[in-house]
Amino acid sequence: VPRVPGQAFDASFAHYAGYVTVSEDRGAALFYWFFEAAHDPASKPLLLWLNGGPGCSSIAFGVGEEVGPFHVNADGKGVHMNPYSWNQVANILFLDSPVGVGYSYSNTSADILSNGDERTAKDSLVFLTKWLERFPQYKEREFYLTGESYAGHYVPQLAQAIKRHHEATGDKSINLKGYMVGNALTDDFHDHYGIFQYMWTTGLISDQTYKLLNIFCDFESFVHTSPQCDKILDIASTEAGNIDSYSIFTPTCHSSFASSRNKVVKRLRSVGKMGEQYDPCTEKHSIVYFNLHEVQKALHVNPVIGKSKWETCSEVINTNWKDCERSVLHIYHELIQYGLRIWMFSGDTDAVIPVTSTRYSIDALKLPTVTPWHAWYDDDGEVGGWTQGYKGLNFVTVRGAGHEVPLHRPKQALTLIKSFLAGRPMPVLSDLRSDM
């Protein structure tokens, strides 16, 4: 991609966009946008970023407003450089997954109605294997998976598929070293329990509703809730009012576009429909930009796809999601045995997959503590959040961030990815003093 429309600056790095066919039979192809590292890409690791949903585009969120180098302008007609882009530290690959999300497609129409966890992991593994044939310089390069929200399923499931593929075939071209997930759907029981507790302790819902949620919704699947649970979720949404459940202390986007999304837990299963801060309407800007014909042409989008309206999140995929594991904790146990670097992080103002949910899920893993709970500090010497190290897993909170941590706290998110990739703890005050 030489340039994208509305790019009024020169980029110091190369970037590529296009498709990889993951099934000839189904005519299924996944869309990617790949950014080389800004400096010395040959020495930097490869990173895959996935957004959640299920049904949300990593191009819309990951590139357009979170960790990508190009963020969409408020007029939806151009892009500006993100000073905290993660391609400062890695070569970063964004994938629209599964088929039917963003610019990804399938010629088999039934595919869009039959997506689920298992096929998503299989297709993503095929994607990576074929993508590395196209970019062979990244074969055996240190490789990490990252993502947020429903990627709490995608990422560990894909990591498991990669490790099992290694064992079955001896193919080591995907050199997976670890993964990191944020505000991640992990375990339905602990996630629900943590959400209801968070909503109650932050004063969003009444005592009575809190009790009813725990009775009727705790043991529910995230994707398939019962009518009884739905009814109480509606009450909880009404009580909480018109706030952004993805970032409970910041203003909502005041436009017709935003009205449905601010219903707290109205649709818990849309765990990837991101909240957006500072400019609470960032998602709206992406809708304008990625529907522009000239943008689609620059990104080599299939012209047939360009004829239908591009969406940040697909309601059709979300409502027709087939298999959804109730818990991925058993996968964590398996992957910890492989010695992978595993980090979880939480923006602490998200009510959709809040910090409490992740803490309950980690507690259920019963891992011994290696480094006790303590504050970590950003470059300005302010508390960036809190962290605890376990045997096989590291947990980090990001103070004041919502569901999309890199959108709300971009500087702190860059510190987070730097620490993760270096395999070192989050900085403490003494680190900052020694740097002065």
Swiss-Prot record:
Disulfide bonds listed in the record: 56-313, 217-229, 253-281
A molecular function (GO) term: serine-type carboxypeptidase activity
Swiss-Prot/TrEMBL catalytic activity: Preferential release of a C-terminal arginine or lysine residue
Matches recorded under InterPro entries: AB_hydrolase_fold (IPR029058), Peptidase_S10 (IPR001563), Ser_caboxypep_his_AS (IPR033124), Ser_caboxypep_ser_AS (IPR018202)
Entry-linked Pfam families: Peptidase_S10 (PF00450)
Domain of life: Eukaryota
PTM notes: The linker peptide is endoproteolytically excised during enzyme maturation.
Class of the enzyme per the UniProt entry, highest EC level: hydrolase
GO cellular component, as recorded: vacuole
EC code: 3.4.16.6
Glycosylation, residue list: 107
Removed propeptide positions: 257-270
Active site: 149, 350, 403
Subunit structure: Carboxypeptidase II is a dimer, where each monomer is composed of two chains linked by a disulfide bond.
Matching PANTHER family: SERINE CARBOXYPEPTIDASE-LIKE 29, SERINE PROTEASE FAMILY S10 SERINE CARBOXYPEPTIDASE
UniProt similarity note: Belongs to the peptidase S10 family.
The name this protein goes by in its record: Serine carboxypeptidase II-2
